[in-house]
Amino acid sequence: SPMGRKGWPAPFDTDLEARKGLAYELVDGIALLSKVDWRAKGLDDLGRPDGFHERQVDRWTAFLERIKGRELPGFEVAAAWLRAHKPLDYVPGIMHGDYQFANVMFRDGAPARLAAIVDWEMGTVGDPKLDLGWVVHGWPDDTDAPGDEFASYVDMTGMPSRSELLARYAEVSGRQVDDIDYY
């Protein structure tokens, strides 16, 4: 990952075609992870997949109540929307919980190759599409000129678009992404 440095390492700093590979490898990592048979791997006790989405809304609402320093207009509306609009399909799988460039490592040089996913303290069996949502929530659709509204700790120039990443995830994982706005 580019953490602790200014910009991407060579050749990804100047080779925009190679840089695209970083994003595809990032998404392939969680897409492939979502396909792991977690029961066969003995991970039955890693999480509680039943009622996962309901618990998430309750958990984060309660957390906010404990730390709230001011009113957040619209928060209750958002929580109610999440409770009323479940994902189209929920297929439990292994999820990281904080999946992003900062929590992956790539092999040195091109082509981009994902080497490791690190920082697993929020890992669980839940909805893997939450990881996808975390990756694309601020991802620009026009990465040729991302603009200041998409300021990020990584240079997004030359990366695949948000739509291209969603299509890639669907292709590799076999999961639909039509309900990505939920995430």
Language model features with spans:
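Active-site activation/catalytic loop segments of kinase-like enzymes and analogous catalytic loops
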Residues: 130-174
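C-terminal, non-catalytic tails of nucleotide-sugar-dependent glycosyltransferases
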Residues: 76, 84, 168-179
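Catalytic-loop of the protein kinase fold
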Residues: 94-96, 101
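Hydrophobic residue at the +6 position relative to the catalytic HRD Asp in the kinase catalytic loop
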Residues: 104-106
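ATP-binding pocket architecture of kinase catalytic cores
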Residues: 1-77, 81-94, 108-112
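All-alpha amphipathic helical-bundle segments outside canonical DNA-binding/catalytic cores
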Residues: 47-48, 176-183
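Activation of the activation-loop gatekeeper triad in protein kinase-fold domains
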Residues: 117-123
